[in-house]
A protein has these predicted regions:
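Positively charged n-region of N-terminal signal peptides that target proteins for export
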Residues: 1-7
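Bacterial N-terminal signal peptides
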Residues: 7-18
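Beta-strand-enriched, solvent-exposed domains that form extended recognition/catalytic surfaces
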Residues: 257-357
Length: 357
């Protein structure tokens, strides 16, 4: 009887771990075209390669709302599930991406800027989808979500405003955008993709207070522990469009890593940030297998304090611009899959001015 109870307990524990460790991935695209800027584009041919890979390898492509509602309700996510998203609502999403998506019957989400759409409403040469086109897509089940009224950064404060005044102004702008989306498509998910992926702690608190789920641009998988004020997405356009690199990302697992108090800060002047300390909850990896890389700095030395905490002293000053630390480790229980966590920084010039986009 004792052995039977031990077996039942072990099976129950394994099942619990399996359900909780299920991971999903959100892919981020912009243009699907051969003639648009390479840094935000994937060719139609390569986009179809991506979708074929998803189908051939039994990934579950689901509406973004399935994943977010699962996290909100703490319902286990289908393992190897994927959501497809497009930022900026370019016309080639309709003319180039949609026929391919329809071929595979894959759902997707488009993040839109209502102010930009409205300015181009009578422009036949516009590169942006119209409300008529977006309504038709909405009627077919495409999720239409918020990318801000204009494509303005949430953290680049202008007009001499304080942080509080700026957030009040941005709240009005974002709610205006949400209302316009609802008026034209009937949808209001309160899903918001940060323009340029830029955010800070104050913006995260603002998103939570205003009941917005906010999506960023740092990489990583998601699970039930994901912070809904900075949901990661994997960029899948050039130069990250090769299947060889996408394969590991699609199979990645969410790394349950958090930041020490005061280290969630994302914005520093050049040469200001020197180190960072992480808390980690997972036991499903060997410490020796953990690797962390930082943009332009390469692989970093990891300093373990105990089994649940480690630090990185940056090998050089973080470069000006958008910077990422990517930490990965092979899973013990799921061979061939990697835990993946990304921490973003937005490094200003030494005088405190913003870098150029």
């Amino acid at each position: 009887m004792k052995n039977m109870l031990q077996i039942l307990f072990s099976v129950s524990l394994l099942l619990s771990v399996s359900l909780c460790s299920n991971a999903a991935v959100i892919l981020q695209y912009h243009h699907v075209s051969d003639s648009t800027p390479a840094s935000t584009s994937i060719s139609p041919k390569q986009f179809e390669v991506h979708l074929q890979y998803l189908k051939d390898n039994n990934f579950k492509v689901v509406p973004l709302s399935d994943l977010i509602e699962g996290i909100k309700n703490q319902q286990p996510l289908p393992d190897k599930s994927v959501a497809i998203t497009f930022d900026d609502a370019y016309t080639d999403v309709l003319t180039q991406a949609k026929p391919i998506l329809d071929k595979f019957a894959f759902p997707y989400t488009i993040y839109v800027n209502p102010g930009i759409i409205n300015r181009n409403i009578n422009n036949d040469a516009s590169h942006y989808l119209s409300w008529i086109q977006l309504k038709a897509l909405s009627d077919e089940g495409v999720i239409i979500a918020n990318h801000g009224y204009e494509h303005n950064s949430m953290v680049r404060i202008t007009d001499g405003l304080t942080q509080t005044q700026w957030l009040i102004k941005q709240t009005e702008s974002l709610l205006k955008a949400e209302a316009i989306i609802k008026e034209n498509t009937g949808q209001s998910w309160r899903y918001y993709a940060y323009p340029y992926g830029e955010y800070n702690v104050a913006v995260q608190e603002w998103a939570k207070k205003n009941d917005f789920v906010a999506f960023s641009q740092q990489s990583g998988a998601i699970d039930l522990s994901t912070d809904l004020t900075s949901v990661p997405r994997f960029p899948a356009s050039k130069p990250y469009d090769k299947i060889s690199g996408l394969r590991d990302k699609l199979n990645s697992l969410a790394f349950n890593i958090s930041l020490k108090d005061g280290q969630a800060k994302t914005i520093f002047k050049h040469k200001e940030a020197k180190n960072i300390t992480f808390n980690i909850e997972s036991d499903d990896f060997y410490k020796s297998a953990l690797n962390c890389y930082i943009s332009d700095l390469g692989k970093q030395k990891i300093i373990w304090h105990d089994d649940k905490s480690f630090s990185i002293n940056f090998s050089k000053d973080l470069p000006v611009g958008r910077v990422r630390a990517n930490c990965t480790a092979a899973s013990i229980s799921k061979p061939g899959r990697y835990y993946w966590y990304s921490k973003p920084w937005f490094i200003l010039n030494s005088d405190g001015s913003w870098y150029h986009l």
